Amino acid sequence: MINSLLEEESTAFAQVVRGIAISSDDYLKNDNIPKVNNNNNNNNNNNNNSNSNNNSSSNDYFNGRYNLVHSSVSIPSFDNFNFNSINSNNGNGNNSNSNSNSNSNSNSNSNSNSNSNSRDEENERLRSEYKKIIKNNTSKLELTRSKSRILVINSNSGEEEEEEEEVKTPTEVDSDNNNNNNGSINKTNKKLKNHGNIVLSKSKSFIDTIDAMELVESCDDLFKQKKILLKMLISENFFQSNQLDQKKLSTFMKSVVDIELMGVPSNILRSSQFKSLYLDYYRELFQNALNVTNLKLGENNKVFGGGSDNNNNPLAIYQKPIKKEGSFLIDSSFFSNFYQYQQLQQYQFLQQQQQQQQQQQKALPSSTFGNILRYQREFKEISKLGSGGFGSVYLSEYVLDGHKYAIKKVNFSISNNQSPTNASSKIEKVVREVVALAKLDHINILRYHNAWLELDPKNNKPRSSSFSSVEGSLGTGNNDNDESDDSFFEDQDEDEDEDEDEDDVSNSNFSDSIKFKGGFKKSSCSNNSISSNLKKKRNDKKYPFKRNLSISFSLNDSVTNTNSQEYSISEYFEKFNLTNNSESDESEIEESDSDEIYSESESEESESEESESDESEESESDSDNIDFENENIKEMIKALTISKSMIPFVKPIKKKKGKIYNPSSGSGASSGSGNSSSIGDSDSSEGNKPKGLTLSTKQLSNSQLIGINNLNNNNNNRNNNNNNNNRNNDKNSNSNNLRLKYTVYIQTQYCEGKTLRDLLENPDFKNNSKTTILSLFKQIITGVNYIHSMGMIHRDLKPANLFLSSGVIKIGDFGLVKDITATTPSTTPLTNNTPSTTPIDTTPTSSANTIPISTPPTSTITPTISVSPSKPLSSSLSSTAATTHLNSSLGCTISSSSSTTTATATTSTTPFMFYNSISVNTVGVGTLTYASPEQLSNKGVFGGGGYTNTWYTNKTDIYSCGIILFEMIVGGFETQFERTTHIKNLKNGILPSWFTSKHPEESNLILRMIDINPDNRPTSDQILSELLPILIEASERDIDHFDYEKLDQQTLISIIKKKDLEIASLKKLLQNTGNNNK
């Protein structure tokens, strides 16, 4: 029985929300619309068939036209629906409505024919009254800027357009939806495009916003079909004096759910599957209301990102919990009319599940990022296998197949104001390992399975400090403080020193020159050299490096004491300088359990997850700061001295005044101190003396100066008298600097035999025969040769990256791999005036090393040389020097009879080198103990006239293999100090006397492999095909018995063939001896 208080408008709106509302055009013009049944409770059984037929017709029409979400659920009739809870302010038609209801009740006892006629008359009357309501309400439909503004979605083009403010009829409003493009609307739309569009205007409370979201989301189908009704619904029925009427809206929403569930059989309502699907549908519908309906919160409401601070954040609406109890928006009272107890019980259960899921994941909705938390869903993490500068590796079980895999997690972050070039370069450095592994397929290469990218939602926030442009590392930087997860934005520190705002440098450029977080590792070295007093004075504080045209470190004045002293650390740079194999105290570094040096990838992208424990609860935004409490000063100096990203090569920068800035003289520093200056801003106008750590530049070359590369015009034009407006602008720009953190997951083969490092540390390894050791080394060279044949350089070969699986060596950890086939030179290297004197070999080119490569442009060498098996290499070359260097570096020989080659045989040219496309100065790449001199030196590759530039070949891997071979033959060292000492001497070309006397041929090969001149090193193909077989054959002659089980298949086949030849020779000898006896 329809309640006597039901008003015509409430009936129309109830139909609208269910998705069965007829558009105003249909009501005004179309007479063939199926009629809505409004039967009475007292209908007798004679009317069942007619009711069923009418409902079926109506359902087919509405379901087919509007493509309803719950198409399997019949459109309910209103026979048993109670509209007690719906209120309305419109008084039009109240009496007529009451009369119609009473008429309908009076006709309930009629026969079936009279009932049918009564229904038709009632429906016709409702339609007529609804037309009047629409026409009456259009006169009140004037939405001004002081009230709520609705942006509508054009269902055809998907463009956002704003309704006109003038009063129109429904037909006029619908026809003019696409023609309202005045200047102010365009300006408003353009401004709102970056906010995920808009939601309701000013509502005072949090509950108001939620109810409004429920309302407009439930009217989604209406919103797309007929906008005028939604305007009426919001402006005339639920807003009074521009404020939302919570009571009316709440009762309306209850009726929405009642109508939704009406007519659904009780057995379906009781089923857990239906309740789960129903609640999930509404939960997702309401949670994404802001993003779907294009309504905007007022500036005074900051619940979902409103206000000046969070206006530019398109994802802020997902970070705030909609309700403390969970994310469900349907209250338990909604089900009071339909099995309240069962529904409420199921709702509470799902609510608890949602709470647990939010606590575990703390993630954005999966609809925003499809791969989010894939690792947690599909893998069961067992243990941590190890960690390094490029990330951490975990042993995980895939739930689908039950197999174990090694999952490498590499974290990186991208800022929204980062230049596309820098962002692309960072992504390339992270993804290059995946690209390389996907290309490689070899028995001696770690097998690659899969890789994917996930967003780390709880760490996505803007950088609040003025140092926000300095990119963090690949560290996770996870903070266990739950409070930091509640907001996608973090408020800027109001007490931040204003001087930092003046020290702003270009975000995109400065991020290339200095990368701090993750650039330093914890070490076991003694920590008492410099920082003991510093720790006592400044315990539990962060000391950000400040920006300036300066050459030293300065502690921020805002967090340091006024009586801070200067600490000179220049002598440590000389001590730790490893650029030319000097007498550096390498033993101290080697004993630190950290062979790693931080390359262009590591300092920008990588950080071990062990750093999570070092971060305080407030430090989630402190990726720009160095904690002197937790970090080791020596490690910091070592990283600054060696890492390319920390010590970029600096070309002279031309100043505006016409002077050339020479970094070595320090003339460009604002402090004007000849040999020493501060990274902190030393404001000369205030006469402030630079405070904090100071780095002397007396013994530093131009390429070792810190933080002065890539300075842009913003820094040159900066003055010391910035006003408060500029500071405020800087803060606003910093608050909009959204930083998204991602994690790359790389799924590879898990080797249970651990690594070659574990094997070397086992005392029993010394008991292996030389043949067994050389057989293992042969597998390493085989894998390296395959990598080189694919046009790649590993650049980080070491025992820890050589994995063992059933006695088979597998090369892994391709975090520093360089695909030299995909690079292009962009900078001309320094010229070497000494021609190469290496003889030209005329043997055919080795196909194993025929790879497309690039050469720096010079006057006598073609800028690009493509080497292919089908084309003679000599036809692509125009210089004997280039041909000669290519012979020696690639192991391929060139036959050339061209006159050009002869004519240019004595011409001074640059040696042909591989070019690293990421940076000309690719120094500090790899592992300190095993990296070649050209990798460590900022001077570059050793040539005929000394070092040229940072161009090097794949022979840098041969250098690493030489050190590995030395360790394998020695069989491990007793102490770390002994290992460090011997490797240090080896790098200087010195082998122990006992080693050379016991292993003369191996000693000769090792010294060739670690030659400081890459031209003198053999190629992997030469070692594999020529040099190593000789050593293996000699070892077989020297040893009568060895363990055949530890030999590889090729070595065993070779031994069998030799044994077969010996047996055949003995048989023949025996046969000849028998014939002679006869």
From Swiss-Prot:
PANTHER family referenced in this protein's UniProt entry, alphabetically: EUKARYOTIC TRANSLATION INITIATION FACTOR 2-ALPHA KINASE EIF2-ALPHA KINASE -RELATED (PTHR11042), SERINE_THREONINE-PROTEIN KINASE DDB_G0268642-RELATED (PTHR11042:SF193)
Sequence ranges of Acidic residues compositional bias: 480-505, 583-627
Protein name as it appears in the record: Probable serine/threonine-protein kinase DDB_G0268642
Active site residues of this protein: D796 (proton acceptor)
Annotated keywords: ATP-binding, Kinase, Nucleotide-binding, Serine/threonine-protein kinase, Transferase
Highest classification ranks of the organism: Eukaryota, Amoebozoa, Evosea, Eumycetozoa, Dictyostelia
Chain residue ranges for the region called Disordered: 31-61, 89-125, 154-190, 460-511, 579-627, 657-737, 823-867
Organism: Dictyostelium discoideum
Cellular component GO terms held in the UniProt record: cytoplasm; nucleus
Family: Belongs to the protein kinase superfamily. Ser/Thr protein kinase family. GCN2 subfamily.
EC number(s) reported in the record: 2.7.11.1
Residues annotated to bind ATP: L385, G386, S387, G388, G389, F390, G391, S392, V393, K408
Composition bias type Polar residues, residue spans: 694-707
Coiled coil: none
Highest rank taxon of the organism: Eukaryota
Record domain Protein kinase: where: 379-1031
Entry-linked Pfam families: Pkinase (PF00069)
GO biological process: regulation of translational initiation
Gene Ontology MF terms in the entry: ATP binding; eukaryotic translation initiation factor 2alpha kinase activity; protein serine kinase activity
InterPro entries documented for this protein: CC_SR_Kinase, Kinase-like_dom_sf, Prot_kinase_dom, Protein_kinase_ATP_BS, Ser/Thr_kinase_AS
Compositionally biased tracts (Low complexity): 37-59, 89-117, 177-187, 664-687, 709-737
Reaction catalyzed: L-seryl-[protein] + ATP = O-phospho-L-seryl-[protein] + ADP + H(+); L-threonyl-[protein] + ATP = O-phospho-L-threonyl-[protein] + ADP + H(+)
Enzyme class per UniProt: transferase
